[in-house]
């Protein structure tokens, strides 16, 4: 702004100097000399002020444009900073001193951590129970109960698998036993039916 003011004063001084130097009039116009000089000076001052105002407006517009451009640039930088993705987090690698575990070892370690966090027992724990004699696994490694021992013991009280034959069964396999269905004596009526010339009215 001070630069523009100095430029305007310089232009004004040059214009006034030219006006005083080139304003040579004859004696007839000597009375109006002061009026002509001031009129020309006023016109030149008006022109100089107009030029200075234009220059000032252009400078101000350029300055405003620069400020606007700087603000726009700062806004773009802020938006770019906001829109930029955060740097990737450093993932903990299982590689220690150049040693990288295999997928099987990684899965085994993951299963151990999972069981530790959830309180689950490994499968080998149950297998050890089953292999141990007298372990608490009633399905795979249990002591034989008394009923099973009775079934394999001769004369045990198991009536289905190992029981003594009843008297009725012994009578059925014994000839002449009192079983009327399997081993009985033929009645007189039956003997008459199979004997020729008997008075059986239904068969003869």
Curated annotation (Swiss-Prot):
GO cellular component, one term: extracellular region
Repeat in keyword set: yes
Tagged with keyword Manganese: no
Propeptide residues, chain positions: 142-150, 163-171, 184-192
Tissue: Highly expressed exclusively within the dorsal esophageal gland cell during syncytium formation in host plants.
Carbohydrate attachment residues: 32
PTM characteristics: Preprocessing of the precursor by host proteases leads first to the production of 21-mer CLE-containing peptides (Arg-130 to Lys-150, Arg-151 to Lys-171 and Arg-172 to Lys-192) followed by an ultimate C-term trimming to give the mature 12-mer CLE1-1 peptide.
Signal peptide per UniProt: 1-21
Start and end residues of each stretch annotated as Disordered: 116-204
Biological processes annotated in GO: cell differentiation
Residue stretches of biased makeup (Basic and acidic residues): 139-151, 160-172, 181-193
Entry keyword set: Apoplast, Differentiation, Glycoprotein, Host cytoplasm, Repeat, Secreted, Signal
Stretch list, region Required for secretion from the host cytoplasm to the host apoplasm: 21-83
Family: Belongs to the CLV3/ESR signal peptide family.
Protein name: CLAVATA3/ESR (CLE)-related protein 1
Species, as recorded: Globodera rostochiensis
Lineage: Eukaryota, Metazoa, Ecdysozoa, Nematoda, Chromadorea
Gene it is expressed from: CLE-1
